Design a protein with these regions (language model features):
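Extended amphipathic alpha-helical scaffolds
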Residues: 124-203, 234, 252-279
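Short acidic, glycine/serine/threonine-rich loops at helix termini
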Residues: 35-39, 153-168, 186-192, 241-247, ...
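Dual-mode signal for accessory low-complexity, basic/Gly-rich regions
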Residues: 266-335
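A cytosolic small-molecule/anion-sensing beta-strand core signal
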Residues: 59, 219, 223, 306
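Short, compositionally biased leader-like segments
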Residues: 1-31, 247-282, 335
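Acidic low-complexity segments
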Residues: 7-14, 20-33, 76-168, 204-239
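N-terminal alpha-helical targeting/anchoring segments
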Residues: 33-90
Length: 335
């Protein structure tokens, strides 16, 4: 698969060079599947295969991006996309800084986060997963709903600055299972994500749901009075908090624009509990890692907080260009 993607990018690079452009081309392909359940039955079963191309053209302090849905087998519309990006760049207002154009120093093929078995999971297997997690929990008044989604994402990059390319492939799955009482109107849910097929565990989801159903069915309802409480977050909630944290926390660009709750002078100071440590580690398979960022910078282990102490802000390349900082390998699709 990577050979055809790389060949396409090299052909588009050659066209950009023929037009005397300085450009970077980003390829993004998704092959996704979704099975949805409602009222203990399949309500939707679908899949989608999309290819998107982003073309970035640079002209000194001018820069323009153009995105398009692409058919890799139709090269002429893609070349016209390059022409459009070039025209947009020529008409763009100059920035107050000079944006860096990616220059890839080596060819990278990174499939550490790709699992062919998860990519090839079938509809009967998705159905059996849900049947297993709901076994013995459904009744006339307790109904199952939820979603099983999975897919493969391929990203690749090239620029006019070198012949080298980058290619990344990853697989992922996300499952949400909900049991709801038709009369009492309560519902409980359990979530699971996976990067490889071996991580799928319907029995664990069933155990979580069974525990919650038992609490709602056997214990009396209570209303908590106003006050201070300790709330324990599960993995999914922690993930949502960290996703928000990405924007209002140790994000260098957002900090300089005044959107972060942190300040640069707090580096080296304790800002959280000593029990809190947060590190961006591209070796951690559970985070769908990539070895290099979109600009070609090799990603390394990057401590953000250690024992509650703020260690550093991360910087994407564009933010680093704008504010005169050094990029930290965080020009990625997800942090």
């Amino acid at each position: 698969m990577q050979q055809s993607v790389i060949a396409l990018l090299k052909e588009l690079r050659a066209y950009a060079l023929e037009k005397s452009l300085r450009a970077a081309i980003y390829y993004h392909e998704e092959d996704s599947y979704l099975m949805r359940f409602a009222n203990s039955a399949i309500s939707l079963n679908t899949n989608e295969h999309l290819v998107r191309l982003q073309i970035s053209v640079y002209d000194g302090n001018k820069h323009a991006d153009y995105e398009m849905i692409a058919d890799p087998n139709q090269i002429e519309p893609l070349k016209r996309g390059i022409d459009t990006a070039a025209e947009m760049a020529s008409r763009a207002q100059a920035l107050s800084y000079t944006p860096s154009i990616p220059c890839y120093r080596e060819t990278v093929i990174d499939m550490q986060a790709y699992d062919p078995f998860l990519a090839g999971i079938t509809n009967p297997e998705r159905l059996e997963f849900f049947n297993t997690l709901a076994r013995g929990l459904e009744t006339e008044t307790i109904k199952l709903s939820g979603v099983f989604s999975n897919g493969t994402t391929i990203t690749a990059q090239i620029s006019t600055e070198s012949e080298h390319t980058q290619y990344f492939a990853c697989t992922d799955a996300s499952i949400t299972a909900v049991l709801s009482h038709q009369k009492l109107k309560w519902e409980v849910n359990a979530l699971q994500s996976a990067q490889a097929k071996t991580e799928l565990n319907p029995e664990r989801l069933r155990a979580e749901l069974a525990f919650l159903v038992r609490q709602y069915s056997e214990n009396p309802a209570v209303q908590l009075p106003l006050g201070k409480y300790t709330v324990v977050f599960g993995a999914a909630a922690v993930g949502d908090v960290l996703d928000m944290f990405n924007w209002v926390g140790p994000n260098g660009g957002m900090m300089k624009r005044g959107y972060s709750f942190l300040k640069e002078e707090q580096i080296g100071q304790p800002v959280f509990s000593p029990r809190f440590t947060l590190t961006d580690d591209p070796r951690c398979q559970a985070t769908y890692p990539v070895s290099h960022d979109l600009t070609g910078k090799r990603r390394e282990r990057f401590p953000l907080f250690e024992a509650g102490v703020l260690k550093a802000f991360f910087w994407s390349q564009d933010d680093a260009d704008e504010f005169g900082r050094e990029a930290t390998g965080h020009s990625v699709y997800h942090n």
